[in-house]
Amino acid sequence: MDKKDLFDAFDDFSQNLLVGLSEIETMKKQIQKLLEENTVLRIENGKLRERLSVIEAETETAVKNSKQGRELLEGIYNDGFHICNTFYGQRRENDEECAFCIELLYRD
């Protein structure tokens, strides 16, 4: 190998190193972007989990309150009073069933 061939080989090797370094820098930037995105998503996920637990607690309270309200209305109805919008608070004659009250009590 003469000096020119050696120099050309060294120059090619140097160019390959520069291309490799450029590719490594590109991959490094992509990894940095992915890490940042991952961090943002982890924070967002944590906030969503907190919000979900608050909503679940509110829903549980609402269901409990709804159940208590329904039981209260059922008690009033069983005591012989209307609970429907049409006759609310009026005594049911001879404790006859009222279709409006029944519908209100047993709707989903």
From Swiss-Prot:
Please tell me where Zn(2+) binds in this chain. 82, 84, 98, 101
Q: Which InterPro entries match?
A: YabA
Keyword flag Zinc: yes
Keyword set, alphabetical order: Cytoplasm, DNA replication, DNA replication inhibitor, Metal-binding, Zinc
User: Which Gene Ontology cellular component terms are annotated?
Assistant: nucleoid
Task: State the needed cofactors, names only.
Answer: Zn(2+)
What's noted on cofactor binding?
A: Binds 1 zinc ion per subunit.
Q: Which Pfam families match?
A: YabA
Top-level taxon: Bacteria
What is its subcellular localisation? Cytoplasm, Nucleoid
A GO biological-process term: DNA replication
Query: NCBIfam families attached here?
Result: PRK13169.1-1
Q: How does it assemble?
A: Homotetramer. Interacts with both DnaA and DnaN, acting as a bridge between these two proteins.
What's this chain's function?
Involved in control of chromosome replication initiation. Inhibits the cooperative binding of DnaA to the oriC region, thus negatively regulating initiation of chromosome replication. Inhibits the ability of DnaA-ATP to form a helix on DNA; does not disassemble preformed DnaA-DNA helices. Decreases the residence time of DnaA on the chromosome at its binding sites (oriC, replication forks and promoter-binding sites). Tethers DnaA to the replication machinery via the DNA polymerase beta sliding clamp subunit (dnaN).
Q: Which family does it belong to?
A: Belongs to the YabA family.
This one is known as Replication initiation control protein YabA
Tell me which species this is from: Streptococcus agalactiae serotype V (strain ATCC BAA-611 / 2603 V/R)
Q: What is the lineage of its organism?
A: Bacteria, Bacillati, Bacillota, Bacilli, Lactobacillales
